């Protein structure tokens, strides 16, 4: 198949060349929409479709009725009955830059003969899911269909009825006779990750991304399979509407608010904006929140809010004039896999790291990506020399999510997972039920020892400022440190012999080490690097037991009483304290002066927070996050990092995001910062 990513406009373009480009696009569309198995990143498809548009604009006599630019989507799958849409489900035009957005506004101005900056827009995140139509007749869900090719979709009613956040009956008296909801069905990241973990544990194929997972789940012929998948709907508009009781609002935003009031889920990030600067501000705000939303988005959707103006603007062949998708920089790109290196982590985990031909992804040059583990290498079928698809989302480490199979070179080289540690040459084993293979060398392995020391000094552990990764590596290379306790035995002369370490730098490092001696029990526990004991678990252990001695002597059953501690973590803790080397290091740290304040709980009558599970979210102005957490601990609370059905209170500061939304959905009691501060004052007064 020819590669058209470098297609250039010229005066000798032939119909044969154009048809080859169209065929390539059709092949990509078929794999994306029908097989749910994309061959190339969205960015590559976007580049090719835009090239085709440009060519057809320059040479309109070459446009054909079946060109990919002249239709919306893909054909329905043969396994589902077809549904004709009364109102076409069209796609949106894309904007990829501020210039594109400005051109969109100029087109509106020219069409309406008015200043587009005077228009109000309804702004929404662009969810990366599957567009659907859901029809309610007299308030009861009767029919659901995919978008398909825009005029004909697939009947997925049985599957949609299994999605928990879609009401089977509208929450209203006198419902409209016919109400068609248009929306996006997607899979939240937490559910997607859990689904893939279950699949890998069973030896089944995992999904490349949440969109593929949502599409595959929605197109199951057995609704019982769909029922087990964590799908959700966010409505973004209304299609057919017939009612003898009420007229719809003439504001798109107000229509979405009305949908929410009758039980239809609507995205929590939807806002109104007026004019170019506010549209850019919304785009920037959503882009900044992207990594924390809990679901995949690939841009924003900007719609003229006034329905009357929408109707005046109307449509072009395949999209409305009154809306545009302003997309984020591509998070997926193609590049060449040059080699694979195997790294050893703090707990001995062997991680394959892909060495890539450097390429720009989401504004950052990427030359390394994770391949996770041996199962992932096998699932991808990837080889050295392959053209691979890499994905970078937010601050997540770039990963390879697929290969372009038809571009594999003849000299591609198979990736062989090591059976011996690449650092200490100890045996590599994989425990049954785990995806990760591990070096058995323990602290004999220099790589594990180095990573354990880096973890010990890190910000969320002992927070030793000025002692970073490079200094740890130098200290180990000179054999000045072997265990965390050795850090507290360093002297100025030893440090001054190191590279870029003068007298002042050495003293600053020693001052930081001295300062770190006063810590908290939770930080100290976390710094020890006990496997599966993260920051939150360490905090829960400290709050529950109150002292290190109590934690050291607790048995498995006592440990399991702690929130978030199950059988596996409890056994890891018991095993850690049974290892005399670990006990010796801890005792040496305490002998070197590491200490912490006792955890004191305030004894207050009628304390509504005692023994409650509390989650903090958003930005607090009257307290730092650590101050708020400490106050809650003193009041006898269990402070968690995630909202769940076990959460009793959510304390929400400014710019609270998905945790607030989830708490509202679960009916959890919510305190804003002022209410929290008032409660603290009241309890302190009592």
From Swiss-Prot:
The keyword Metal-binding applies. Residues 604-686 form the BRCT domain. NAD(+) binds at residues 42-46, 91-92, 124, 147, 184, 303, 327. Keywords: DNA damage, DNA repair, DNA replication, Ligase, Magnesium, Manganese, Metal-binding, NAD, Zinc. SMART domains: BRCT (SM00292), HhH1 (SM00278), LIGANc (SM00532). GO terms for cellular component: cytosol. GO terms for molecular function: DNA binding; DNA ligase (NAD+) activity; metal ion binding. The active site is at residue 126. It catalyses: NAD(+) + (deoxyribonucleotide)n-3'-hydroxyl + 5'-phospho-(deoxyribonucleotide)m = (deoxyribonucleotide)n+m + AMP + beta-nicotinamide D-nucleotide. Belongs to the NAD-dependent DNA ligase family. LigA subfamily. This is DNA ligase.
